[in-house]
Structures are given as structure tokens and as C-alpha cells.
Amino acid sequence: MIIAFFLLIQCVYCVIWPPLSVDNEVALRSQRDVSYNVSVDQLVDVGVRLSTVIFERDTYTQPYLNRVDNLLNASVGNILIDAYWDEGGFNWQLCPAPFSANVTPIADGSTILQLEWDNKQYTCDRRLDLASIFTRIDEHIRASARSVSLNLITIYMSLHSIGTQNPTPVSQPGTLSRPLVRSIDQVQILTPASLRVAQLSNSTYQGLEFDPNGYPILGELLQSRGIRVIPIILENNMYEDTSYELERDSNLYFIQNSTIDVTQTNTADTKLTDLTTNITNWTIADSQALLSESFRLVMETEEDPFSLESYTNHISHGYSPFLNRKYNESEIRQFAVNRLWSWKNSYLPEVSVPLLGDQDDSNSANETLQCASFSNLSWIISSCDEPRQVACRNSSYWLQWTVTSTLSNYYGATEACPVGTFFDIPRTPLDSMTLQREIPLNSSVWIDLNTLDSGGCWISGGAEAECPYHRVTLVSLYVEILTPSSVVSIVLIAIVVLLHFVRIPIQKNRKYWRKLQDNIKDSDGIPS
């Protein structure tokens, strides 16, 4: 009872990442699909530091771990895990205090311990470790393997030392790799070796352009190779004379400043602030300079937390913002719904065609609202019949855009582009920035995105493009419609049908039934 009450009190403060609405899912999926031909180091999404956003700074127990599922189900693409190496116990753990420290169980036989370390108090569950998080990630990977919500997860690790060094080595010390490969199939992990193979086979890129030292594109990893995870050791804050040898994990993890160069900065960087507030004077050279930097991250600090404006500015300029403090539900919801660089506010407008929109409904006011235009760094649902200028990409230099001087409806957009260009859509935030510089403020142009083939399935490829998810989407939606109440109704109908065809045994033996009725009629006791 004590443990249950303790966990209940903790969970009052659990931060719940809001689930995706249908509109959120459609928006997120269309942005992902448009980015399929983009190298994975140029992808932009919100990141979450688990130790500060999900866990309390001093509490590591199961109720908080359950909140990781919310992040994964919402397809959050970047997760930062603080891992602690117990120098005395030779093991990795999530708890910032060594279990060999001054320990007090909260109840007899409990795995939840009160620990005192470095003049701080911690509450930690012994059962909660790195494998606990990796297992949740694996469960998400398996659940979404055949789903339209397929996504890539980049796991960043920040390493710390705790405890007193033990002069006596052990035969099998812990490693970061062991819990990862025991939880997630290694074929689903991009490793330094598999990246090198891709580079040698000339299948790596920088953005949309071939680069022998670049990274695979998103579509190849997800669709062709089934890779779902990129593990990166981002920060090494361990003792200088630590007993842990980082090279043990170099075959599985990318290591910052060794096998990978992550561009990491924080909100206190005034140079970055100047960069991310520049929109009107943005140049192709600005985009090209940032493209040379891989996995661009910006971490908020206690002194300079994200505002909603700075958060969205970083996303628009190609940086993945990492949430790194405690939030209330209202704040976290604002950041969650503004995480996309494409459809602003993460929502498709209410006038959008539903996911299962009836294409034959001639009375629908939304029947022509099936095409997308671009304005003020945002995709906007528009009527396909409206005349607009057209966004055309240079065939030789992918960051160069041309906007037609003549107007066209969506159906004629492909033919409207001049020689040497083609009708296309911005596929990264930096791509959007270079297109925006060609468009007058508050004006809009056609981009190659529509839902003409199937309501809610936003695809590029012109007006004749076919939705690859139509059948899958229908099936998944019908499964969602089959709610528990529907299941109960079906079971009740089955019981009624079963009783209709199967007679109860007592009615089959009519002779015995009549004898039983006669016996009941006999008086029992003294007649009055």
C-alpha cells in the first residue's frame, strides 16, 4: 500500500506528451514522405531530454518510464538519455546515484530505494535501467513496422561517472552496447560500419545532393533496409581517469568528434539567435553553409528557455530543438503541436479533406481543397482551381528556385515550369527558406503536394500521383473504429446466435422434464 501510494503521488507530476490527432498524423506523415529523399542528418524534429522532461531530476521509477511510450507513439524522432557509469560497480544505470551509496528501501522487499549521493537525495527503482528504455523503443518499432507511421529514432547519449572507483576490475564489465542489442535487433540499427558500407557504395547524400561522405536518405533506411534507430554518444562528461573504455561501444554507437560530428549549440548562443531570426535577408549561401553541418541540435538552458517563437524559429532554420526543463501540460502541448516545419501548428485546417474523404461527394464544399500552396514558410491547403504562380526547382542546383511569372491552376502547374526546372516541393526547412526568398510576403505559390487520389493522403508527383497508403489507411482506420464497445456488441450477437442453434440439455430429455414438473406439483408438508 505504501509503495502504491508513493507511485501515485509521483505520477501526479508525470508530464504526458499529447497524443497525435488524426490531423497531426496526416501532417506528420506527409512531411515525412516529402523528406524521404533527404539525407537523415538533415532531418529536423523536436528532441526530448528524458532526465529533465520525463523524469524528475531526483526520481527514476516506473510511472515516469511509462511516459516514454507517449513520446514514441507521437513519433518524436530525437531522444536524449543521461546514462551513469558506476565506477565502483562497473555498470551503466539511469539513476544518478550509485546503488552502493547510502540506501533506504521505501518498504520491506521494495526495489524502490531512497539514495543519498553527493549531498543529494534520489529515489530510484533498481529494475529501471537502460534496457528498460531500449525495450520500450523496440516495442514501438515492432508495433509500427507495418504501419503508415513508420519513423526513424535518433538516440543521443550523455555519459556521466558516479561512485568511487574500484581498483579491482571485473571480468565482464557493463557496456552501453549490451542493453541496446539485447533490446533492439542490430539489423535495425545504423552503425558506423553500415554507414561506411553505404558511403563506399555511393548511396549517401548531403540533403538532396550526392556526397560520398554523407548519409543515407530517409526512404532508403526505412523502406529498403528496415533501419529504425541511430545511436549517438553525444556528450562525454565522465571522470578523466574513468574506468570505462568508450571504444567498447564504437562498433555500435557513433561517437561525437570521432565517428560523427553533431552540430550542437544552445539557446544562450547569440550568434545562433541572430541566425534564426533572419528570414527576409536569407540567402542560398546561408542554407548551403548550414547544410555542411550534420544533425544540428539546439539545447535550451535554464537561463534561456525556449519561447514558442524561438522554438519555431529554430525549426524553420533547420535546427532540432531539444526540450530540457520541466513543463506544465499547457506548455508541452504548445511545443508538441508546433513541431513541424511544413504545416504550421502541426494541424491541417478544419476545411481539409478527411482521411477517408468521399471523392465522389458532389455536395462537399471541400471537394476542390485537395492541393497545397506555399506561403510564409508554411504549406497551406488550397482549392486546386485557383490561379497561382508555381514553384519550380532548378534541375542542376537543388537549392535554387524559380517562381513563374504567369498564373496557373494546380492541374497545369507541371507544364508551367520553364525549361531547366521542374514542379516540386520544399523537402527540408532550409529548402523552404530558399524558396521563401523568391516569394513576396503574404503571397502564395503552388507546390507539388496534393490529396487528389485519396482524401487525406498528401503526396507529391503531380495531379496524377497515386497514394501508396490508400488500402493500408482504410484498414487501419477500420481497426480503430472497432472499439471495445463494438467488440462487446459482436460478442453478444454471437451468443444470441449460438443459443438459437444449441438447445439446453434439459429440454432435449422431455420425459425427464415432465417427471420433474409432476414432482414439483406434489405438496410437501402438512396440507392446510
Swiss-Prot record:
Its main location: membrane. Pfam families: TIM-barrel_MTC6. The chain crosses the membrane at residues 481-501. Residues 1-14 form the signal peptide. Residues 15-480 are extracellular. The keyword Disulfide bond does not apply. This is Maintenance of telomere capping protein 6. The lineage of its organism: Eukaryota, Fungi, Dikarya, Ascomycota, Saccharomycotina.
